[in-house]
Design a protein with these regions (language model features):
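N-terminal low-complexity, intrinsically disordered segments
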Residues: 58-63
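Active-site-proximal segments of metal-dependent phosphoesterases and phosphodiesterases across multiple
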Residues: 132, 136
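Conserved alpha-helical segments that form or flank metal/cofactor-binding pockets of metalloenzymes
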Residues: 68
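DG-centered beta-turn motif at the end of beta-strands
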Residues: 9-12
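Terminal accessory/targeting
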Residues: 1-6, 17-33, 37-56, 71-92, ...
């Protein structure tokens, strides 16, 4: 069995800087997959790019959180349980998961998919911003079941995993816990007919890896070229021409650097 790595550009549509980076990397042939944050200010531009370029796998990055301190967005539906007093979505995935009214959440997720369609794109697949729909943050796994049911209704794949492997760690979760989570995910994925990758490779920004981009690059490429057989998906948010007040320099990595790294990995494993 061959090894496949899907590298998905998350946060498409989050801001103009994200759009510029993703546009450029698609055109260079360094990306084949991305997902749009529909509630965000630059989402329409991203969705229209997707509509004009159906050769790319561009889906919807289902969003229920707004993590930036001074750059925010709110739910399309205005649902009370999905926003703070400011009118914006909550900062943390655990808060979003614990506070969400299931009926309001269903309406919001469907609104995001339908808004993408209204802008002309047909989402190729669905995934989730910050893991706020996985259920593992607070144990509200009914949130995950709802999400997978919606995926099934729309006939869309969802980014989670159907297998566990020591070479593809889930940060902060030992193998036993990963197996327990898999026991929840897999039956619902089968019940609702939702395709998923075999493995989900989560970026793990430890303090050690935050010391420099070069160090992170070296370590992440070691992981990428040693993925197990099957389909593995990983992801990252891309920006260009934009600096943020973050502890990690990774948030300022340029599209030129990403282009070089992708060419290196492509020589070792098959990129999807």
């Amino acid at each position: 069995m061959k090894r496949y790595l899907i590298v998905n550009a998350d946060d498409f549509g989050m801001c103009r800087a994200a759009n510029e980076a993703v546009f450029d990397l698609f055109r260079r042939g360094c990306l084949k997959s991305s997902t749009v944050m529909i509630p965000c200010p630059a989402a329409e531009e991203a969705a229209r790019f997707a509509a004009e370029n159906p050769q790319y796998a561009i889906g919807v990055h289902l969003t229920t959180t707004s993590e930036w301190d001074t750059y925010k967005w709110g739910p399309l539906t205005g649902a009370k349980s999905l926003k703070e007093e400011t009118g914006f979505m909550t900062h943390h995935a655990a808060d979003a998961e614990s506070r969400a009214d299931l009926k309001e959440l269903e309406a919001e997720l469907k609104a995001q998919i339908e808004q993408a369609r209204a802008w002309g794109m047909e989402p190729s697949h669905l995934d989730n911003h910050m893991g706020s729909l996985y259920g593992h943050n607070t144990g509200r796994f009914e949130v995950l079941e709802l999400t997978l049911r919606i995926c099934g209704e729309y006939g869309k794949a969802f980014r989670l995993f159907t297998d566990v492997h020591e070479l593809v760690p889930f940060p902060g979760m030992i193998m036993e816990m990963q197996s327990q989570l898999l026991g929840i995910i897999k039956p619902w994925a089968q019940k609702y007919g939702v395709p998923m990758p075999n493995y989900l490779l989560m970026p793990n920004w430890t303090d050690d890896l935050r010391t420099s981009y070069e160090h992170y690059r070296e370590e992440i490429l070691k992981i990428w070229v040693n993925i197990p057989e099957g389909i593995t998906e990983t992801f990252g948010g891309l920006l260009t021409g934009f600096r943020v007040c973050m502890k990690s320099p990774l948030f300022t990595c340029s599209k030129d650097r990403i282009s070089k790294e992708m060419s290196i990995v492509n020589s070792r494993i098959q990129i999807r």
